[in-house]
């Protein structure tokens, strides 16, 4: 019988439920249990694929091509499991499914209501994940904050599941914030009110995770336990830590892992967290600082690139390097030039993105890395920018571009994929998900991966224009990764350069703590070597031609 853990949040949004869920999954997996995870998002969008990163942050792409909440990235990285489109459900999806069934006549003329039709659809999605994953434990995070009107159908559905699957097979965890006032005193009243709001919809929390930026003493735990009607053992302090990867160990040391196993009636097995403890020990070690520039469109909101950031850290931790990310707005590069803004960095990364705003700054950054021998990693749009920059150099003209930004460009080295030309809808229509890529022996990409074929996750409509393949290759561009039919260019690189590699896919989605992605590992290693060499010379060297 599958066990279910439902995680809600109170007091404020962004209280850390996603990291908490991911950490709980890690504790259960360390005890030998199989785990799957679901995020229930209360917004009416079908998925975040068409949402602004400023509204939602990163869109995380699953192997089966779903555009999902960034929390799924945390789940995958912490638990080291590949999730699917079943793991992210939105209110938009639920209502769309129910209305479609009503239009087909599935409800036989009945009046469609939130209860039971919407709640039944929510429960069906949870059950579908449990059946398909065959997991011992399914953890479900309910987005938003208890008290929000948008979350009510989800809360009602998980309340009903207590009866559907049996009380012994369900655990409710509530994550709250303990704010402090100017005297330094932590206040429990918001948590008490949040627990009461949860009770008002028929749910009594079994565990309270208390977020705070300072230690929580036993008196406060006992007070919360009294008002929430839970064991003191079930009031778990979660202080702010230096690294999110410390959270599973904090929860384990507070006894949460054993408590969950006990309450769910699972076999009591000791956790194997040695690899995780070794990871955290490496994070805490003193390391050489390595400045890396991330040149993007949404750099004001770091969550827009959260998987890229984590992938950089994974590779840096392995090599005992403290990566110092310099957040560079691409529009600033356009105004001020790359030499001024990229001075003193030893690696340049241009991540994925869409739209014309800031594109010339990204192209200039890619060209600056090429000219000055600074290690470069381009991801998706970052690969297209590198292609445009190189082609402008080879063809001797600035009139080289992607048709996404200039449909009338004389040299469209990046063009819309043929199977995208008749598509008018935006949502869920790109080239999405896992696709194979054949690597060319003797290239940096092949050496980094150490194999002939890989599978990577994609999210794009535009691709390298094969009309320019021959002329660019003859000028020194190395095409090191291709689709199996050899029609799609997946990786490009430059041979006489410390590291200039760019991929059409998103390698960041498959990086894991303790198992960094090969392209990020190679990039960080090359940047570290450039740092050592740079101590004997002044960086940067010269302005790029594209600035």
UniProtKB/Swiss-Prot annotation:
Which species is the source of this protein? Chloroflexus aggregans (strain MD-66 / DSM 9485)
- Reaction equations catalysed: UTP + L-glutamine + ATP + H2O = CTP + L-glutamate + ADP + phosphate + 2 H(+); L-glutamine + H2O = L-glutamate + NH4(+); UTP + NH4(+) + ATP = CTP + ADP + phosphate + 2 H(+)
Tell me what controls its activity. Allosterically activated by GTP, when glutamine is the substrate; GTP has no effect on the reaction when ammonia is the substrate. The allosteric effector GTP functions by stabilizing the protein conformation that binds the tetrahedral intermediate(s) formed during glutamine hydrolysis. Inhibited by the product CTP, via allosteric rather than competitive inhibition.
Q: Which residues make up the binding site for L-glutamine?
A: 54, 353, 381-384, 404, 461
- List residues binding Mg(2+): 71, 141
- The active site of this protein is located at 380 (nucleophile), 506, 508
> Its encoding gene is what?
pyrG
Keywords, A to Z, come to: ATP-binding, Glutamine amidotransferase, Ligase, Magnesium, Metal-binding, Nucleotide-binding, Pyrimidine biosynthesis
So where does CTP get bound? 13, 148-150, 187-192, 223
What's the protein called, per UniProt? CTP synthase
**Which residues participate in UTP binding?**
13, 187-192, 223
EC number(s) per entry = 6.3.4.2
**What is the annotated quaternary arrangement, including any partners?**
Homotetramer.
Q: Which HAMAP family match?
A: PyrG (MF_01227)
Going by the record, the broad EC class of this enzyme is ligase
Reported function: Catalyzes the ATP-dependent amination of UTP to CTP with either L-glutamine or ammonia as the source of nitrogen. Regulates intracellular CTP levels through interactions with the four ribonucleotide triphosphates.
């Amino acid at each position: 019988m599958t066990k279910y853990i439902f995680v809600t949040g109170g007091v404020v949004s962004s209280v850390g439920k996603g990291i908490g869920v991911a950490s709980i999954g890690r504790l259960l997996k360390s005890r030998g249990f199989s785990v799957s995870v679901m995020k229930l998002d209360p917004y009416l969008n079908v998925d975040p694929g068409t949402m602004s990163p400023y509204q939602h942050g990163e869109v995380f792409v699953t192997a089966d091509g779903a555009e999902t909440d960034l929390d799924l990235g945390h789940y995958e990285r912490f638990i080291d499991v590949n999730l699917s489109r079943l793991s992210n459900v939105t209110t938009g999806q639920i209502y769309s499914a129910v209305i479609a069934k009503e239009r087909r006549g599935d409800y036989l003329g009945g009046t469609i209501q939130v209860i039971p039709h919407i709640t039944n659809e929510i429960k069906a999605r949870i059950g579908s994940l449990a059946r398909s994953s065959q997991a011992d434990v399914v953890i479900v995070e309910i987005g938003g904050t208890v008290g929000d009107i948008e979350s009510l159908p989800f809360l009602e559905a998980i309340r009903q599941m207590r009866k559907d699957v049996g009380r012994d097979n369900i655990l409710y965890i509530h994550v709250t914030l303990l704010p402090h006032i100017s005297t330094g005193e932590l206040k429990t009243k918001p948590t008490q009110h949040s627990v009461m709001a949860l009770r008002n919809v028929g749910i009594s929390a079994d565990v309270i995770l208390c977020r705070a930026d300072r230690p929580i003493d036993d008196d406060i735990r006992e007070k919360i336990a009294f008002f929430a009607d839970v064991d003191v053992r079930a009031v778990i302090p979660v202080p702010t830590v230096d690294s999110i990867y410390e959270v599973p160990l904090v929860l384990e040391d507070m006894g949460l892992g054993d408590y969950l196993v006990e309450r769910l009636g699972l076999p009591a097995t000791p956790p194997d967290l040695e690899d995780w403890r070794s990871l955290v020990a490496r994070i805490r070690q003193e390391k050489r600082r390595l400045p890396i520039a991330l040149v993007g469109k949404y750099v004001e909101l770091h969550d827009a690139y959260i998987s890229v950031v984590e992938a950089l850290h994974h590779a840096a931790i392995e090599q005992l390097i403290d990566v110092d990310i310099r957040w560079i707005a691409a529009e600033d590069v356009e105004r001020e030039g790359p030499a001024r803004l990229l001075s003193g960095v030893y690696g340049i990364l241009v991540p994925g993105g869409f739209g014309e705003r800031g594109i010339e700054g990204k192209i200039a950054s890619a060209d600056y890395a090429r000219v000055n021998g600074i290690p470069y990693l381009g991801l998706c749009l970052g690969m297209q920018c590198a292609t445009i920059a190189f082609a402008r150099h080879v063809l001797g003209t600035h009139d080289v571009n992607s048709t996404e930004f200039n449909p009338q460009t004389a040299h469209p080295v990046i063009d819309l994929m043929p199977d995208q030309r008749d598509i008018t809808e935006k949502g869920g229509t790109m080239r999405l998900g896992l696709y194979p890529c054949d690597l060319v022996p003797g290239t940096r990409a092949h050496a980094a991966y150490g194999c002939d074929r890989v599978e990577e996750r994609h999210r794009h409509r535009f691709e390298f224009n094969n009309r320019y393949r021959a002329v660019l290759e003859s000028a020194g561009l190395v095409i090191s990764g291709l689709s199996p039919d050899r029609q799609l260019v997946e990786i490009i690189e430059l041979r006489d350069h410390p590291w200039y590699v760019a991929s059409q896919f998103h390698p960041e989605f498959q990086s894991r703590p303790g198992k960094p992605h090969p392209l990020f590992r190679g990039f960080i290693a090359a940047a570290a070597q450039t740092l050592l060499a740079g101590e004997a010379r002044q960086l940067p060297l010269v302005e790029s031609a594209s600035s």
